Regions:
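Histidine-acidic metal/acid-base catalytic patches
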Residues: 2-24, 28-106
Length: 106
């Protein structure tokens, strides 16, 4: 198992495939290593997909300790161009669990 981003980056370097990227799971990264913004920035060229879930609880963004408004602004600032997907359990209903998206409307 890979428990840290550096392990995934080292594996990609060893394989040498330019078309393979890290799927950065924010929930697990926060649990295992923290420092989300710094880690994403450091490994930005190797990250191709980011999964969203808050911590603790693996619920939707805004229900835990991760400051998603800062993190989304940081992704914009550093020029992240990859995919972002959601992999969380809604704290209540699916409809209510999608409410966090309204904070992204500019």
């Amino acid at each position: 198992y890979l428990n840290r981003t550096v392990q995934a980056a080292d594996l990609l370097a060893e394989v040498g495939a330019d078309n393979a990227f890290i799927q950065y799971d924010i929930y697990h990264a926060q649990r295992m290593e923290g420092e989300l913004a710094a880690t994403i920035e450091k490994y930005l060229p190797r990250i191709g997909h980011i999964q969203l879930a808050d911590n603790p609880g693996r619920n939707e963004p805004g229900t835990g300790e991760i400051h998603y408004p800062f993190l989304f602004a940081h992704l914009d600032r550093i020029g992240y161009q990859g995919w972002i997907g959601c992999e969380y359990k809604p704290a209540t209903t699916t409809e209510a669990g999608l409410g966090w998206r309204q904070s992204l409307v500019r």
